[in-house]
């Protein structure tokens, strides 16, 4: 029985890994600027050879992340203790004290991890962050669905969620916005909450409860 349980877990890990690579790979294709003739692809790339981000909010989020990493707060300066962005609504600027910080925290963390192994600019890390984070949605979907159906049902549900048109069109490589969290984090919340309720051990309940709160 124990060996069968181990085999089931290993099989699930392999399937999840394959699904992750699949959904990430589909999102990564945006970096190739498919459909654009090779002779004019350079027009769609910046000076570093990286494709331009797909919409303006991505550049705003990148700038906020750069500010956070540079001086520890969002915006160019502080006004009455609140971050003030001088690049928005120029020349007056605007208050960014209410800016949602998760995307900057996650991206700066990934930047630190990646640069432990190779040099990569913050812009490059940000370019891939949306595709990476959104692909993690396969984990909670597969685990949760596998427990109430089977491998085939879990695979189908995972692909439906991870490749949903509205989700994938807002989380491909080069789309650097908070949409990456809109499906992934709620799914992890549901998974952790269910585990907190079902677990027999108090310590496990506490751990999963904490994780579910963090995921909100």
Question: What are the residue ranges of the model-derived segments?
Answer:
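Short hydrophobic/aromatic helix or loop-helix immediately within or flanking a transmembrane segment
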Residues: 60-68, 77, 82-118
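Membrane-embedded, hydrophobic transmembrane alpha-helices
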Residues: 1-13, 28, 101, 105, ...
């Amino acid at each position: 029985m124990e060996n069968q349980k181990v085999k089931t877990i290993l099989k699930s890990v392999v399937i999840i890994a394959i699904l992750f690579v699949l959904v990430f790979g589909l999102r990564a294709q945006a970096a190739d600027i498919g459909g654009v003739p090779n002779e004019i692809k350079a027009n769609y790339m910046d000076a570093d050879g990286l494709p331009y981000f797909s919409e303006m909010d991505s550049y705003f989020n990148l700038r906020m992340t750069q500010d956070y990493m540079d001086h520890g707060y969002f915006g160019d300066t502080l006004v009455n203790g609140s971050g003030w962005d001088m690049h928005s609504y120029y020349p007056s600027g605007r208050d960014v004290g209410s800016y949602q910080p998760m995307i900057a925290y996650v991206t700066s963390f990934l930047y630190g991890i990646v640069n432990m192994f190779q040099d990569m600019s913050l812009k490059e890390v940000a370019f891939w962050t949306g595709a990476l984070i959104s692909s993690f949605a396969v984990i909670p979907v597969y685990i949760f669905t596998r427990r109430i159906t089977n491998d085939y049902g879990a695979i189908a549900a995972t692909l439906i969620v991870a490749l949903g048109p509205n989700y994938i069109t807002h989380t491909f490589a080069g789309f650097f916005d908070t949409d990456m969290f809109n499906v992934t984090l709620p799914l992890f919340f549901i998974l952790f909450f269910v585990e907190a309720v079902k677990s027999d051990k108090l310590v496990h309940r506490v751990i999963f409860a904490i994780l579910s709160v963090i995921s909100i």
